[in-house]
Amino acid sequence: MSNVDHAEIAKFEALAHRWWDRESEFKPLHDINPLRVNWIDERVGLAGKKVLDVGCGGGILSEAMAQRGATVTGIDMGEAPLAVAQLHQLESGVNVEYRQITAEALAEEMPEQFDVVTCLEMLEHVPDPSSVIRACFRMVKPGGQVFFSTINRNPKAYLFAIIGAEYIMKLLPRGTHDFKKFIRPSELGAWSRSAGLTVKDIIGLTYNPLTKHYKLAPDVDVNYMIQTLREE
């Protein structure tokens, strides 16, 4: 069975034309992107690296990593977001190879081909996150690194990521997230280790509704990102 949730894909298909509008539903992704790219770049040195972006959507992260000097491939199962990504790179002049394929299928085709794999804000949108994590392990070279980000599953995350973000501040459309699909750091760590990855670091991403600014912080109660390594 394919590890694809067609209802999840449909959500983002409907919004795809606004992906690069910084005042749209995708404003949070634009706002947090520099923080995440910097965090990744500090740990791997993106320049000259061959990078795979799993669940690339409209290409916000993919383009940013390419601008840092990486050779980037972005994959997604959403046809409309990929079309937007391909159009936008014509405007921006950034070169990214985009493909409509699952991580699992690409792992069969391109094992151990990438220095770095990123999979950000994607695991909470698939039926079996552990399957994606195993595919990421297969695609990264020995000695390479894989980065994941997702949302913690606890009452605070429900309050901030769903009630706050979707209903009160309206940062995201209602129904963007399903609380049951949120992932605790302990679960993400266990799935990563089971796949063969070593967890190296974890960082939280916090939002101040008064200043409307995001920052990286030790608080992993809501949004967080982990760095993992495939040992040589």
Curated annotation (Swiss-Prot):
Record bears the keyword Lyase: no
Pathway in which this enzyme or protein is active: Cofactor biosynthesis; ubiquinone biosynthesis
A biological process term (GO) from this entry: methylation
SUPFAM superfamilies: S-adenosyl-L-methionine-dependent methyltransferases
GO molecular function, one term: 3-demethylubiquinol 3-O-methyltransferase activity
Catalytic activity line of the entry: a 3-demethylubiquinol + S-adenosyl-L-methionine = a ubiquinol + S-adenosyl-L-homocysteine + H(+); a 3-(all-trans-polyprenyl)benzene-1,2-diol + S-adenosyl-L-methionine = a 2-methoxy-6-(all-trans-polyprenyl)phenol + S-adenosyl-L-homocysteine + H(+)
Listed Gene3D superfamilies: Vaccinia Virus protein VP39
Binding residue positions for S-adenosyl-L-methionine: 36, 55, 76, 120
UniProt-listed InterPro entries: SAM-dependent_MTases_sf, UbiG_MeTrfase
Domain of life: Bacteria
Enzyme class name: transferase
TM annotation in the entry: none
Keywords: Methyltransferase, S-adenosyl-L-methionine, Transferase, Ubiquinone biosynthesis
EC number, UniProt record: 2.1.1.222, 2.1.1.64
Role played: O-methyltransferase that catalyzes the 2 O-methylation steps in the ubiquinone biosynthetic pathway.
Similarity section: Belongs to the methyltransferase superfamily. UbiG/COQ3 family.
Record-given protein name: Ubiquinone biosynthesis O-methyltransferase
Organism of this sequence: Pseudomonas fluorescens (strain ATCC BAA-477 / NRRL B-23932 / Pf-5)
